Amino acid sequence: MRPWASIPLALLLCAAFSRADCAQDHRSNKNAGILVTDFTISGTQTISATELARMTGNLIGSCFDDDPEELGERIRALFQDRGYFTAEVKHVGFKPGDPLAIPKPVTMDADVAEGPLYKLAEITFVDNHAISTDRLRQAFPLKKGSIFSRTKVASGIDALRRLYGSRGFLDYNAVVDSEPSSNATMSLKLSIQEGPQYHMGKLEIVAAKEVADRLRLQWKLPEGAVYDYTYLDKYISANRDLLPSGFTRDRVQAGADCPHALVDLKLIIDAAEDKSPQPKNVACEKTKEDPK
């Protein structure tokens, strides 16, 4: 074989080995992008070297689009998660390594002015009727005087969603408004949209009769009862011995009928037994006052 005939294969092998593993892959195009091999932050005034190391460690080893603006937003989010709500990312720079590698390894640096450390001054809830303000505040992980973290705000909204869902309010939504003060505190207001309270509709279990009868016997949420969104997970966990291996709520079809405030469920244990249509979602008609 002529020596040059093996060159294309060699190039293919080199290209294959140049594709680095990403700890987390955030690229929109898997055949491009960058791999952050090192990351330094400069310009901060009050943050310790230990805390900066934790922040840079969140991005080192991960892959991103070759977009300094996007990385700047991610870096800003790291600061906001630690209470630096007005942090300003002044510059993000890349120093590339091997230009032929996919993704391209880079050393990243960022110039950041962190600003003041914000704490929560107060949290208020508006338009909540079904659940008391005290109960909502108890479920929210961000407490008065604690560092204002955007991650905790997001987890708090999810916690309220679970709480409302457990009481049948499946259309719950919260509009969040945050207002910073000159004394480095943040006031948080959540405007609650509860929607209708749903009740349990029909339960269909798609399985052989013996299995379906046993599973139905274990179902403790009767038709007409307030629908608890969290009950299905508890039911699946408690009946693992009756359910197929790896069964999750993704195998359950749900249809929410908003006008009648009912939820029909269909548990598909054996797809071969499935002869009925999927439960339908029926939306409520929007009123003239409804801004949506």
What are these regions (language model features)?
Residues 1-5:
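Positively charged n-region of N-terminal signal peptides that target proteins for export
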Residues 21-292:
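Interaction-mediating elements
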Residues 7-16:
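Bacterial N-terminal signal peptides
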